[in-house]
């Protein structure tokens, strides 16, 4: 890979040489760089442990279906200028025609949320429980079905009407057509084809399912997306959204971001936009990265890193530069954290303390198992957060089974 040495990075390197000579900064700074290509052509999956894990063309997809065991939504490619409009009841499918595009300016489009991957644009209007926004869970049939439809505006000016019809046994079903009803098609996306991944991508124009997410571990996705930069103001930005198993702590006001500040696991968050876009600013025709900020990142492997952005060229080249210091290595006996919607903190936990369990969908039942298969606790749950006590747990490994109407997930809990 080509390496980009900007004056800003050279200044960082010079200060780092001084810092490394001191006892407080004995660990090596690893510099890395990669490119999103001019115009941010590519989205880049990045592993803090090992570098670029994969790339994909940003414009190749329109929808990204959440294929995690308890996933139940779809994202739109808002970073490419795509918009999603609510269009009423599915029974009005034949009523929607080309006149919708003429009146779309009076309708507020739905947006992806940027706190969690489960906040797809199709989830707008949901209640976080049985109503997913696009569809409602049927407690009799145990399926999610929809009576809603949407209109999609694609970046090339094409308009489509679209309905995400159902999610049954891990299979999304949907239909799509031009506004005048031509080019109608139906298709499905099965979660089982994407085990261990977060998203299955889809191109509506080509009617093509795309497997773009790398098989190898990744921690950050550098991508063009839409962020609410202030209340009611949505704007296209370029930045990093994290893997759901990654946690991040942001530290500001540092004289030397490679040395100052300390990791505090209690200050870490699993919000996917914890790094986001605001580590840089634009002015005078160029970008400047913040020279007083670092991020402490706990990767999917459990390794803890100090991460500092050292350069960003903007859309002219798409080049990104950073430096990182390994604070604590991964436990090689532990497998990387899977892509789940449920999270435990702290983990590991000290015996006798409480553990907070959060889930991106509404939980219905929690079961704690010992590693030898003995049931330790059964907890009825309703909502997206619950506190579990470890008072009755001896030090060791446990399995926490989380159930919701979307499915089940199992998280490993270590009690020390």
Predicted regions and their residues:
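Surface-exposed loops/turns
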Residues: 350-351, 394-395
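Bacterial N-terminal signal peptides that target proteins for export
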Residues: 2-12
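Surface-exposed, beta-sheet-biased, low-hydrophobicity segments with strongly acidic/polar composition
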Residues: 26-329
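C-terminal tail/sorting-segment detector
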Residues: 26, 395-416
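Residue-level detector of functionally pivotal "anchor" positions at catalytic/ligand-binding pockets or at interdomain
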Residues: 325-345, 351, 359-360, 364, ...
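Short, glycine-anchored, charge-dense loop/turn motifs used at functional sites
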Residues: 369-376, 398
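Bacterial N-terminal signal peptides
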Residues: 11-19
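Glycine-centered tight-turn motifs at strand-turn-strand junctions
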Residues: 375-393
């Amino acid at each position: 890979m080509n390496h980009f040495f900007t004056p800003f990075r050279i200044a960082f390197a010079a200060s780092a040489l001084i810092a490394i000579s001191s006892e407080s900064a004995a660990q090596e700074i690893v510099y890395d760089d990669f490119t999103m290509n001019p115009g941010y052509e590519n989205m880049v999956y990045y592993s803090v442990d090992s570098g670029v894990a994969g790339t994909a063309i940003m414009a190749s997809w329109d929808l990204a279906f959440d294929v995690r065991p308890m996933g139940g939504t779809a994202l739109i490619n808002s970073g490419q200028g795509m918009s999603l409009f609510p269009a009423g009841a599915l029974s009005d499918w034949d009523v929607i025609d080309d006149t919708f595009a003429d009146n779309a300016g009076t309708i507020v489009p739905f947006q992806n949320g940027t706190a969690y991957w489960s906040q797809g644009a199709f989830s707008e209007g949901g209640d976080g429980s049985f109503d997913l926004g696009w569809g409602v869970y049927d407690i009799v049939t145990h399926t999610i079905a929809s009576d809603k439809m949407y209109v999609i505006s694609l970046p090339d000016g094409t308009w489509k009407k679209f309905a995400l019809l159902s999610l049954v046994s891990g299979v999304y079903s949907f239909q799509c057509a031009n506004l005048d009803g031509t080019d109608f098609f139906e298709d499905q996306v099965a979660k089982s084809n994407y085990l261990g991944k977060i998203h299955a991508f889809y191109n509506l124009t080509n009617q093509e399912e795309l497997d773009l997410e790398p098989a190898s571990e990744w921690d950050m996705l550098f991508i063009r997306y839409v962020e609410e930069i202030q209340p009611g103001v949505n704007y296209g930005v370029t930045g990093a959204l994290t893997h759901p198993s990654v946690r991040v702590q942001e530290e500001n006001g540092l004289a030397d971001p490679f040395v100052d500040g300390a990791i505090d696991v209690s200050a870490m968050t699993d919000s996917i936009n914890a790094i986001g876009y605001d580590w840089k600013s634009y002015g005078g025709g160029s970008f400047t990265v913040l020279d007083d900020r670092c991020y402490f990142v706990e990767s999917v492997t459990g390794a803890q890193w100090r991460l500092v952005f050292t350069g960003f060229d903007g859309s002219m080249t798409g080049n990104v530069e950073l430096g990182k210091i390994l604070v604590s290595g991964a436990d090689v006996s532990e497998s990387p954290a899977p892509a789940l919607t449920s999270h435990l903190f702290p983990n590991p936990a000290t015996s006798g303390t409480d553990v907070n369990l959060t889930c991106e969908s509404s939980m219905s039942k929690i079961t704690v198992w010992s590693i030898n298969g003995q049931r330790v606790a059964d907890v009825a749950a309703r909502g997206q957060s619950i506190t579990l006590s470890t008072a009755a747990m001896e030090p060791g490994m446990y399995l926490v089974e989380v159930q919701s109407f979307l499915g089940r997930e199992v998280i490993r809990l270590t009690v020390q």
